[in-house]
């Protein structure tokens, strides 16, 4: 006999469905479920007296006959392509489908088969997102990786060799020997990793050898001398080997101004770090490059969003990170030239317009590794409060804005760095790097972080308790973070050139090396999803006032933020 459930009762049992709305943490962002893949009355749920039992929601199919390894049931998916409710199937560490799970022997419309060998993760009332990608990493200490994983990041790309002076300031792993050792160290972590070589050179030989050694990108940094000659040389080498170039431009304008740097690009594709400029770059107008078709711009999280405390914390941060001495007037002037409230305020709005395309951390080098996701949603919330709904959000929800902002730390860095075939979104065929959230803690503290199909990090109670939930409940590494599981569920990104030179055979590594691809000529800002706007940006050199297509971009600093102290009492 059919039974009609009231919406609250249905949501309590199976999670929200089409037309229901969910608040994200304590923000003013509300999503609405656009589609539910289930068949009402055929929902699957695990537990005593529930559906997923032998002969009911669980069939007899073996893995060889098509059963999934894992099914995440009834999850609300937030991704760049939409906001839906569905079951998600995982197999051999990858996503095999998004749809309706169950037993096709007795249920109609089954896309994903539950068999005796299928594990279940309950997604009812929870939100599922793709694992985050932080593309601005200073590999200063290995402990960063657990911190990133705990926040919901599953891919880290950058450079460094540990707490060396060069690494404190620049995201470079310089030279073949260092690159090889860092790739070998990757086996010890449940995290996709990629390493950038040093790109500052005026001759190509020193750059090519780093690519052959395994660098998946090259980084141009002003502390090593980002001159027009170095920019031109680095981009030429990158074009030859299909890798991305990241740039931190010349704050002091010693070797040229922003216009000279743009000329050195010669229209070639480049990833511009901390494009606002507080993290470094031509003062005061580096942000002009965010309007160019060949520049893929990102932010780092200390300036995200603009608050009453942003300016004060930046000066000391900058002095430490760039090996400056506050007693030297020139060093102090260098630091102060980079910190401008006008451009930081404009950065908020350019993100909301989709003109700044990515978020990242700048880990321990003017950025916080564990706060990329939180700062992204704080920025989105601040813009909702100050600017109101986006024009695209006409249905009394924030779906478009939410899709725009999630793309900034998932699919867009994956596209930029040539790995979107493997990661960056919840789509069939991609690595099962997934994060499950309780809506009240969305963007702050994940329930589960799934790495390559295996739970690698989770909120967990007292291990000596009789049940999993007694206090203290906090994030802890799970089995996916140990032993050989780490190498079987994570990737190291490198170059096609390195693999052609036998890198896998040369190094003592167990995990798979995957080449980056499609990072050059055909990759333009319009390739970046929901974040490809290219306004004409002007910055007054005297007042620092920012205009986009003639409109002054300014907003007030926030005095308080969501996703902050109420979530971090201990």
UniProtKB/Swiss-Prot annotation:
InterPro entries per the UniProt record, alphabetical: Amidohydro-rel, Metal-dep_hydrolase_composite, Metal_Hydrolase, Urease_alpha_N_dom, Urease_alpha_subunit, Urease_AS, Urease_asu, Urease_asu_c
EC numbers, comma separated: 3.5.1.5
Family assignment from sequence similarity: Belongs to the metallo-dependent hydrolases superfamily. Urease alpha subunit family.
Enzyme class: hydrolase
Ligand binding (substrate): 221
Sites of N6-carboxylysine modification: 219
Cofactor note as given: Binds 2 nickel ions per subunit.
GO molecular function: nickel cation binding; urease activity
Domain of life, source organism: Bacteria
Subcellular location, principal: cytoplasm
Positions contributing to Ni(2+) 2 binding: 219, 248, 274
Pathway membership, UniProt: Nitrogen metabolism; urea degradation; CO(2) and NH(3) from urea (urease route): step 1/1
Annotated binding of Ni(2+) 1, by residue: 136, 138, 219, 362
Keywords, alphabetical: Cytoplasm, Hydrolase, Metal-binding, Nickel
Quaternary structure (record): Heterotrimer of UreA (gamma), UreB (beta) and UreC (alpha) subunits. Three heterotrimers associate to form the active enzyme.
Protein name: Urease subunit alpha
GO terms for biological process, alphabetical: urea catabolic process
Compartments in which it is found: Cytoplasm
Cofactor: Ni cation
Residue stretches making up the Urease domain: 131-570
């Amino acid at each position: 006999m059919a039974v009609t459930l009231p919406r609250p009762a249905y949501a309590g049992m199976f999670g929200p469905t089409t037309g229901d709305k969910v608040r994200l943490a304590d923000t003013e962002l509300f999503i609405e479920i656009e589609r539910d893949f289930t068949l009402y009355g055929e929902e699957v749920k695990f537990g005593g007296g529930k559906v997923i039992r032998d002969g009911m929601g669980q069939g007899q199919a073996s893995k060889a006959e098509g059963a999934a390894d894992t099914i995440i049931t009834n999850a609300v998916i937030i991704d760049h392509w939409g906001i839906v409710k569905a079951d998600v199937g995982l197999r051999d560490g990858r996503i095999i489908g998004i749809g309706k799970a169950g037993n096709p022997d007795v249920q109609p419309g089954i896309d994903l088969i539950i068999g005796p060998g299928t594990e279940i993760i309950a997604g009812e009332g929870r939100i599922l997102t793709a694992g985050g990608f932080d593309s601005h990493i200073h590999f200063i200490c290995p402990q960063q990786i657990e911190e990133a994983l705990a926040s919901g990041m599953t891919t880290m790309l950058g450079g460094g060799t540990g707490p060396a002076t060069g690494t404190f300031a620049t995201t470079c792993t310089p030279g073949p020997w260092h690159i090889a050792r860092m790739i070998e160290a990757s086996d010890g972590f449940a995290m996709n990793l990629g390493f950038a070589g040093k790109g500052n050179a005026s001759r190509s030989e020193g750059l090519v050898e780093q690519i052959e050694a395994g660098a998946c990108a090259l980084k141009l940094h002003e502390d090593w001398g980002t001159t027009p000659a170095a920019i031109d040389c680095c981009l030429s080498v990158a074009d030859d080997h299909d890798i991305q170039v990241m740039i931190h431009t010349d704050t002091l304008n010693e070797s040229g101004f922003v216009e000279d740097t743009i000329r050195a690009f010669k229209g070639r594709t480049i990833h511009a770090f901390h494009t606002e400029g507080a993290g470094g770059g031509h003062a005061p107008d580096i942000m002009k490059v965010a309007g160019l078709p060949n520049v893929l711009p990102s932010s780092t999280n200390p300036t995200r969003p603009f608050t009453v405390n942003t300016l004060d914390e930046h000066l000391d941060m900058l002095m430490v990170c760039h090996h400056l001495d506050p007693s030297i007037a020139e060093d102090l002037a260098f630091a102060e030239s980079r910190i401008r409230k006008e451009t930081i305020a404009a950065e908020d709005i350019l993100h909301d317009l989709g003109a700044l395309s990515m978020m990242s951390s700048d880990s321990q080098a003017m950025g916080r590794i564990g706060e990329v996701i939180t700062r992204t949603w704080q920025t989105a919330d601040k813009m909702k409060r100050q600017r109101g709904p986006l024009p695209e959000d006409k249905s009394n929800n924030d779906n478009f804005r939410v899709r725009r902002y999630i793309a900034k730390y998932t699919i867009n860095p994956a596209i930029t760095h040539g790995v979107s075939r493997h990661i960056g979104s919840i789509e069939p065929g991609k690595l099962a790097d997934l994060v499950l959230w309780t809506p009240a803690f969305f963007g702050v503290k994940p329930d589960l972080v799934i790495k390559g199909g295996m739970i690698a990090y989770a909120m967990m109670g007292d291990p000596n308790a009789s049940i999993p939930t007694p206090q203290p409940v906090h994030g802890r590494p799970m089995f996916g973070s140990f032993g050989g599981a780490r190498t079987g569920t994570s990737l190291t990104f490198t170059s096609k050139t390195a693999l052609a030179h036998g890198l896998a055979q040369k190094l003592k590594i167990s995990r798979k090396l995957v080449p980056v691809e499609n990072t050059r000529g055909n990759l333009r800002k319009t390739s970046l999803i929901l974040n490809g706007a290219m306004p004409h940006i002007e910055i007054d050199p005297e007042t620092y006032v920012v205009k986009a297509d003639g409109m002054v971009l300014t907003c007030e600093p926030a005095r308080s933020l969501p996703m902050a102290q109420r979530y971090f009492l201990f």
